Amino acid sequence: MPTPTPPPEPFTVSPQPGLDLHGEEEGCGRTLVLVHGLTATRRYVIQGSRVLARTGGLRVVGYDARGHGDSSRPPDGLYGYPALVADLEAILDERAIERAVIAGSSMGAATAIAFCLEHPDRVGALVAITPAYDGQARTTAGALEVWDARAEALDAGDVDSFVALTGVDSLPERFRAAARLAVRQRIERHRDPSAVAEAVRQVPRSAAFDGLDRLSEIAVPVLVVASGDEADPEHPFAVAGEYARRLADARLVTEEEGDPPLAWQGARLSRAIAAFLDDHRA
């Protein structure tokens, strides 16, 4: 009989007193750190796929951001990008990771890039999955209105309103049901929705790095995973394309026309990451 695959190893890292970040790691080999998006958890970077840890020769480390999933709310009340970058540094330090591939989704992509700009010696490669950060914080009332409404829904425990405010009901019918279910399941994984609500207020108002021109400073190879606007308008294809254009060593991948976004397909996304890392083993 085949040897059973051991379960992921849970861990807790405390970047500051009163803040516990919960995560897990699995596999051995080159280290891949997963950094999730706003209102998501560690599961949603590669959609729960365990292919990379089990067959990809990688040590896969994932964690829930402050206030998300199983992690606690920060005692200082800060959820912006400087805090997220500091938390990522703490994860690497406490898990004895000198250098890693960092894969981030949406908010996590901006966090990973900001970390690489601050600590280039600790990053071997990047995977930017559906980047949405366009180089500046949101400042206008119009840009912030929907985020504040989503935060209010979370504070009220009104999951139905939160789901509706994500815009899933305006997606093409072939994507609508899956997107609606995914949003609902994602929100139900948080132990403290009011902490997530505060993150939803703060992150859009926070700057990860100052302008897309800074992308040219990144020397490591970067896999940019784009989604088509039809299924995922909140992560514009044009933004991912601009990342790929400005980065010194980038590969842009996306789904076939008419398919669900590659970022929604854990096994396919994992294979794309594995192929990219096979080409960049340094």
Regions found by a protein language model. Give the residues of each.
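Flexible "cap/lid" loop of the alpha/beta hydrolase fold
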Residues: 113, 117-118, 123-155
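Short beta-strand/loop motif that positions the catalytic acidic residue
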Residues: 218, 224-226
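Conserved alpha/beta-hydrolase catalytic His-Asp/Glu region
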Residues: 138-141, 156-205, 209, 214
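Active-site loop/oxyanion-hole signature of alpha/beta-hydrolase fold enzymes
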Residues: 16, 61-103
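Conserved alpha/beta-hydrolase "acid-adjacent" motif
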Residues: 231-239
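Gly/Ala-rich beta-loop-alpha elbow adjacent to hydrolase catalytic centers
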Residues: 104-108, 112
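Catalytic active-site module of serine/aspartate enzymes centered on a nucleophile-bearing elbow/loop
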Residues: 249-282
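Conserved HGGG/HGGXW glycine-rich cap/lid loop of the alpha/beta-hydrolase fold
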Residues: 15-73
